[in-house]
Curated annotation (Swiss-Prot):
Species of the source: Wolbachia pipientis wMel
Catalysed reactions listed for this entry: UDP-N-acetyl-alpha-D-muramoyl-L-alanine + D-glutamate + ATP = UDP-N-acetyl-alpha-D-muramoyl-L-alanyl-D-glutamate + ADP + phosphate + H(+)
Role: Cell wall formation. Catalyzes the addition of glutamate to the nucleotide precursor UDP-N-acetylmuramoyl-L-alanine (UMA).
Pathway membership: Cell wall biogenesis; peptidoglycan biosynthesis
A GO cellular-component term linked to this record: cytoplasm
Gene: murD
GO aspect biological process, one term: regulation of cell shape
High-level lineage: Bacteria, Pseudomonadati, Pseudomonadota, Alphaproteobacteria, Rickettsiales
Family: Belongs to the MurCDEF family.
This protein's name: UDP-N-acetylmuramoylalanine--D-glutamate ligase
Length: 509
């Protein structure tokens, strides 16, 4: 990405991980003079090898009056980090790589921003997948995979995943479409309060021409009702929605709006939930329709068991479990948001549906690895909070649940109503004692030394069952007590599965 605005300007970059190095690369190619630093010596040493012309000087020695901007990596908290205080003392603009990208893109290039506590990576990828299948030149990145400044310069549409860390840094946002999927407590240690966390998410929809907002979540439903811009509600629950609704057909030929407001407030409201997205009517009666029934199994059709006629209604189309490669329960909200975004962009319904059917999903997200004897193995390492784990637990029954790590606010108390699905829990990490207290007298559990110990014990226990068992790694916790990230945790689980499968195959030869 060409950042011509910063040609011959002095720009400071702090935080020399993937995002910071991406910013240095783009700024250097654009003719900026770079001053780079990091809190960690090894990061500085690595950057020095890559960018020998940069000035690697401690920020306390900068002439801040000559610095045009400080580009801050999302891993660096704005409060109370010393570099932020230093820059503010000299009224230096603090920017994120996303802001540099939005400044540099051309006016005819569309940007879709996706955020939410859960589901944003899958939604971002699915939108990109469908747009590519529709023949659009698409670039996908941000918090997911490729930093935005490394994306192709000539894309028609950019689909960007935005985390709360990235949004926190942003002062100005201007995107064509935003998708806010849900908000539940997360990253409170970074943001200081739930109110601050919510405020980061609001930045995105407030800076968008059209906002797609999930309304099955109390917080985001409230945001939807108060938001006065052009907005689209999505829902996958039975609960009737208290929103004015029009059909997507009424918007088919309507271009993206150039303003957010009309005289009467919101331009129109488009509902994907007029007749409820998820249809369980053939299988379920008399349940609490505010949420899925914890006594009913919503199993993946690949298992060959459970309810197989669950369908997702999207206008005149219906998707069943067997139609898609991804877990329908876990991804219903993601699919609904994707459908809305693609319709606003003018993609026809058949192309969207075919794209949903052909999408293979992402690693570590309710990922069915395979079966050994009577035991299925599911890698849901991305589930770093209770709400995310809830969707996985609702997808299976007879579960040996591997859970734990660095706990988020609220822990797993909200999952107690689903403990009937869990035959035994195998607890790991810092949260072990707290999770054990919640499970006491409700579900059997064992405290494990580590993931390897939990994997071994869960499999040994499952072999004692005459029924099929699912070993589910869905930690409901961050990974940072034992791993670099959720990917590393998930890869370790996958290696354990592959080693076990190899050993059992050898035994059968």
């Amino acid at each position: 990405m060409q950042l011509n605005k910063y040609k011959n300007q002095n720009v400071a970059v702090f935080g020399l991980g993937k995002t910071g190095l991406s910013a240095i690369n783009a700024l250097t190619k654009s003719g900026a003079r770079i001053y780079a630093w990091d809190d960690h010596e090894e990061q500085i040493a690595n950057a020095k090898m890559m960018y020998k012309k940069c000035n690697f000087i401690h920020p306390k020695e900068y002439n801040w009056h000559e610095i045009s901007a400080l580009v801050l990596s999302p891993g660096v908290p704005t409060e109370p980090h010393w570099i932020v205080k230093l820059a503010r003392r000299f009224d230096c603009k603090i920017k994120s790589d996303i802001e540099l990208f939005l400044e540099a893109k051309t006016t005819n290039q569309k940007v879709i921003g996706v955020t939410g506590t859960n589901g944003k990576s899958t939604t971002t990828s699915l939108i990109g997948h469908i747009l590519k299948s529709a023949g659009k030149k698409v670039a996908i990145g941000g918090n997911l995979g490729v930093p935005v400044l490394d994306l192709e310069r000539d894309a028609e549409i950019y689909v960007i995943e935005l985390s709360s860390f990235q949004l926190e840094l942003m002062n100005e946002i201007n995107v064509d479409i935003s998708a806010l999927l849900n908000i539940t407590p997360d990253h409170i240690d970074r943001h200081g309060s739930m109110e601050n966390y919510i405020a980061t998410k609001l930045k995105l929809i407030n800076g968008s021409e059209v906002a797609v907002i999930g309304c099955d979540n109390e917080i985001t439903a409230d945001i939807f009702n108060k938001f006065t811009g052009d907005k689209i509600p999505i829902s996958v629950t039975y609960s009737p929605m208290s929103f004015q609704c029009v059909t997507l057909e009424s918007r088919k030929e309507k271009p993206l709006p150039t303003t957010q407001m009309t005289e009467g407030g919101a331009r129109d409201l488009i509902s994907l939930a007029g007749n409820n997205l998820l249809d369980y009517s053939e299988q379920i009666t008399g349940i609490d329709r505010n949420y899925l029934d914890p006594s009913v199994s919503y199993l993946d059709d690949k298992r060959g068991t459970g309810i197989q006629k669950i369908s997702l209604k999207l206008e005149n189309h219906s998707l069943s479990v067997s139609d898609v490669k991804i877990n329908l329960i876990s991804n219903a909200e993601n699919i609904a948001a994707t459908y809305a975004v693609c319709k606003v962009l003018g993609v026809d319904s058949n192309t969207i549906i075919n794209g949903i059917k052909s999408f293979s999903g992402l690693r570590h997200r309710n990922e069915l690895l395979g079966k050994i004897r009577n035991v299925f193995f599911v890698n849901d390492s991305k589930a770093t909070n209770a709400k995310s784990s809830e969707k996985a637990i609702l997808s299976y029954e007879n579960i040996n649940w591997i859970a734990g790590g660095r706990s988020k606010k609220g822990g797993i108390e909200s999952l107690s109503k689903h403990f009937t699905r869990v035959r035994k829990a195998f607890l790991i990490g810092e949260s072990t004692e707290a999770f054990a207290n919640v499970m006491e007298n409700k579900v059997d559990y064992v405290k494990c030394c580590n993931l390897e110990d939990a994997f071994r014990l869960a499999f040994e226990e499952a072999l004692n069952s005459a029924e099929e068992v699912t070993i589910l790694l869905s930690p409901a916790c961050a990974s940072f007590d034992q791993w670099k990230n959720f990917e590393e945790r998930g890869e370790a689980f996958c290696r354990m599965f592959e080693n076990l499968r190899y050993n059992h195959t050898c035994c059968l030869v």
